[in-house]
């Protein structure tokens, strides 16, 4: 699966070979095979004269859903991102540069938070101050797995971020490879270097999702992507 981001915002794009448009295009690539695809899109952010950061995210087997509990199970163990490319806007974006930001501001870390370490995707402890790191937790401040299994259609979780350089990060969440639209989930984190942390709780109404994409009472994959604006 290939996703496209402009200044951290996910973009819908057209695959010129199939004429299909969407935020995620899935390609079947055999071992040792090389594929070249032409795409086109109109950014939904940016004004004339702006320079936007363009990033692609590759997710291997995006339709895979876990069938058992596993700490290390997550699509981010199979993610690859190319280096950002800057594009120059010669015209206004299709929404004339409109921005609907839900910014989560930083707060000063407590000493306990400052001294703490978190698991990386391989289950190893590491400090988060040198590089930006985001953790998904439940409301009891416990890290949760990258799968979800709910019976009532409501998902409650907290995203916590810290470390790295001063920057804004656009958070995009996916369930079974399908993006959660902005009316369901929308957040931009502001990271400040040093002893600062961002934290925001989310209550996601999964009943708004396509019933063919999310199954109540069954395991569903959940991951989110933090991309600098």
Question: Where are the model-predicted features located?
Answer:
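Intrinsically disordered, low-complexity Pro/Gly/Ser/Thr-rich segments with frequent PxxP/GP/PP motifs
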Residues: 13-48, 182-209
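Beta-strand signatures of extracellular beta-sandwich domains
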Residues: 3-5, 170-174
């Amino acid at each position: 699966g290939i996703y496209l981001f402009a200044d951290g915002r996910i973009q819908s794009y057209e695959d010129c070979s199939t004429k299909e448009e969407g935020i995620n295009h899935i390609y079947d690539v055999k071992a040792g095979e090389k594929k070249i695809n032409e795409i086109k899109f109109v950014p939904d952010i940016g004004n004339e004269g702006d320079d936007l950061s363009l990033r692609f995210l590759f997710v291997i087997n995006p339709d895979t859903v876990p069938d058992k509990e596993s700490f290390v199970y997550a699509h981010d163990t199979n993610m690859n991102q190319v280096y950002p490319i800057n594009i120059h806007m010669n015209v206004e974006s299709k929404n004339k540069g409109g921005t609907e930001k839900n910014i989560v501001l930083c707060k000063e870390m407590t000493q306990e938070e400052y001294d703490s370490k978190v698991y990386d995707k391989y289950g190893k402890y590491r400090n988060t101050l040198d590089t930006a790191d985001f953790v998904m937790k439940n409301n009891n401040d416990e890290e949760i797995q990258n799968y979800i299994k709910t019976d009532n259609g409501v998902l409650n979780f907290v995203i916590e971020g810290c470390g790295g350089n001063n920057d804004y990060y656009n958070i995009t969440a996916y369930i079974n490879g399908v993006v959660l639209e902005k009316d369901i989930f929308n957040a931009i984190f502001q990271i400040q270097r040093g002893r600062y942390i961002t934290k925001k709780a989310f209550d996601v109404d999964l009943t708004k999702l396509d019933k063919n994409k999310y199954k109540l009472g069954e395991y569903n994959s959940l991951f989110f992507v933090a991309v600098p604006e």
